């Protein structure tokens, strides 16, 4: 397991790095769309499983992930079914394939429910809980009764910021996370979230990489998400 920074990617070519270190393949995660290695993966000859990013037309690279589009659609539909109309979205990072997919899913799910996507109710949280303090005040001022979050850490920050400002979760504001990390059930209140099956992702990554090493091309594998209903969502109180 090796951390690969943007600066390192500029200094070291992807194929060269793997070959000189004796690696026969790699599982890559956390790359942004503008990262140097993403471009290089279009032509790599090294078996590569790419988590949450997609490279088309290269049989040596497979895109593995959870269906983010379906996951965000589940989250929005859950809130709509609870009567929420002013739904905010605190997404992940800019320049991310997954964030782009989730933004598209959020807008489509809202449109399907005949609900507008308000510009002041969408923002990027870069997957850190601290981001909530910069965006939640604006969401609350704009009348949000629910917040869909790019991951569970953002959701924890949203809950904390709502509580700090005198808004109860879920009585005043419902919050939905994404991932279902191990501590999500211990949040106060326990977090309603979209589960990614991490163990299954790991098993799939190994199996796919083994297939690629043996020249069996697999272009894309998406796992199904699951809505985990806990106590951070409730029927809308129709707060103005």
Task: Name the predicted role of every residue range.
Residues 117, 135-240:
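Flexible loop/turn connectors
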Residues 27, 49, 62-64, 88-90, ...:
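Hydrophobic/aromatic beta-strand patches that form the interior of the parallel beta-sheet core
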Residues 1-77, 139-142:
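Alpha-helical recognition/docking segments in bacterial nutrient-uptake
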Residues 13-14, 36-41, 105, 135, ...:
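A short acidic, amphipathic alpha-helical/loop segment
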Residues 76-87:
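Glycine-rich phosphate/diphosphate-binding loops that line cofactor/substrate pockets in enzymes
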Residues 2-11, 64-74, 90-135, 148-156, ...:
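Hinge/beta->alpha junction and helix N-cap segments in small-molecule ligand-binding domains
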Residues 42, 111, 163:
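Anion (oxyanion) recognition and catalysis
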Residues 24, 85-86, 145:
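Short acidic/polar active-site loop segments enriched in Thr and Asp
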């Amino acid at each position: 397991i090796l951390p690969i920074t943007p600066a390192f990617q500029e200094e070291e070519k992807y194929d060269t790095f793997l070959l000189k270190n004796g690696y026969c393949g790699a599982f890559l995660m956390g790359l942004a769309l503008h990262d140097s290695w993403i471009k290089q993966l279009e032509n790599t000859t090294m078996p590569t499983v790419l988590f949450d990013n997609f490279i088309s037309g290269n049989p040596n690279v497979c895109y593995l992930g959870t269906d983010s589009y379906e996951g965000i659609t589940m989250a929005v539909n859950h809130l709509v079914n609870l009567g929420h109309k002013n739904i905010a979205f605190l997404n992940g990072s800019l320049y991310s394939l997954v964030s782009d997919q989730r933004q598209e899913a959020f807008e489509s799910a809202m449109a399907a429910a005949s609900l507008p996507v308000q510009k002041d109710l969408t923002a990027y949280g870069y997957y850190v809980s601290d981001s909530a303090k910069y965006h939640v005040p604006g969401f609350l001022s704009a009348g949000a009764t629910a917040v869909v979050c790019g991951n569970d850490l953002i959701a924890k920050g949203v809950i904390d910021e709502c509580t700090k400002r005198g808004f109860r979760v879920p009585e005043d504001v419902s919050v939905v996370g994404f991932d279902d990390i191990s501590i999500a059930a211990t949040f106060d209140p326990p977090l309603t979230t979209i589960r990614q099956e991490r163990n299954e992702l790991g098993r799939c990554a190994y199996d796919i990489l083994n297939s690629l090493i043996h020249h069996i091309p697999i272009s894309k594998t998406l796992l199904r998400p699951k809505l985990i209903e806990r106590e951070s969502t409730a029927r809308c109180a129709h707060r103005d």
